[in-house]
């Protein structure tokens, strides 16, 4: 259940942050992202633009902005993305305008992106980025999850498994590591990370005024 006002904690104004979840395909970042958005107050999911085909049940503008390759290339050329990458022959990118609007309003923005996108975000706004890398408990478990979700062909799954090793090699570029052996436990870990980062003094931009007012009252 969400509660509290966006842009504040205990009535203290704060700056929004960009919260990144990355993982090899099948390790659970998308499930964790949805759980976090459902429960964390003031957290909004960043909606990426993509050139990949729409999957059953997906809605344009909610899950992704589905665009063709010429449109995507034009957006890159115009500098409309905070980050973008080519993944499995499809392009993904984060539109700049809605993210900047959310942060300026004091909302947190959640990113379900790969390590390349994370590095691009850091290069543009390092102080506002908090990154978490999700690992599977084993290679066997990862492969089992990819087969169980029945979204991809065997050939695509082999490609995802091959890429997983490269993605895992960048774990040390992240602030936090969570092993997803149990989705409930992993979720509690990720939620605790978000809460701790929200409470950091430097993000509570209204804390000086809050303390000054209490001191003023004590001095009466």
Curated annotation (Swiss-Prot):
Its EC number is 2.7.4.8. Keywords: ATP-binding, Cytoplasm, Kinase, Nucleotide-binding, Transferase. The keyword Isomerase does not apply. ATP binds at residues 23-30. SUPFAM superfamilies: P-loop containing nucleoside triphosphate hydrolases (SSF52540). PANTHER family: GUANYLATE KINASE, GUANYLATE KINASE-RELATED. Essential for recycling GMP and indirectly, cGMP. It is an enzyme of class 2 (transferase). GO terms for molecular function: ATP binding; guanylate kinase activity. It comes from the Bacteria. It comes from Rhodopseudomonas palustris (strain HaA2). Pfam families: Guanylate_kin. It catalyses: GMP + ATP = GDP + ADP. Residues 16-195 form the Guanylate kinase-like domain. Belongs to the guanylate kinase family. It is found in: Cytoplasm. InterPro entries: GK/Ca_channel_bsu, Guanylate_kin-like_dom, Guanylate_kinase, Guanylate_kinase_CS, P-loop_NTPase. This is Guanylate kinase. One of its GO terms (cellular component) is cytosol.
């Amino acid at each position: 259940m969400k509660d509290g006002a966006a842009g504040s904690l205990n009535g203290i104004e704060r700056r929004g942050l960009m919260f990144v979840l990355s993982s090899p395909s099948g390790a659970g970042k998308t499930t964790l992202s949805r759980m976090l958005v459902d429960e964390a107050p003031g957290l909004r999911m960043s909606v990426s633009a993509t050139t990949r085909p729409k999957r059953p049940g997906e809605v344009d503008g909610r899950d992704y902005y589905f665009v063709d390759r010429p449109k995507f290339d034009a957006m890159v050329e115009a500098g409309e993305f905070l980050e973008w990458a080519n993944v499995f022959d499809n392009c993904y990118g984060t539109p700049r305008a809605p993210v900047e609007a959310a942060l300026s309003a004091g909302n947190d923005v959640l990113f379900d992106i790969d390590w390349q996108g994370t590095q691009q975000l850091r290069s543009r706004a390092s102080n506002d980025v908090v990154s978490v890398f999700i690992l599977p408990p084993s290679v066997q478990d990862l492969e089992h999850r990819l087969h169980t979700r029945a979204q991809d062909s065997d050939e695509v799954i082999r490609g995802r498994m091959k890429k997983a090793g490269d993605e895992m090699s960048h774990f040390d570029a992240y602030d936090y590591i969570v092993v997803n052996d149990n989705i409930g436990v992993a979720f509690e870990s990720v939620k605790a990370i978000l809460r701790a980062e929200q409470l950091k003094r430097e993000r509570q931009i209204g804390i000086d005024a809050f303390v000054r007012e209490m001191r003023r009252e004590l001095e009466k």
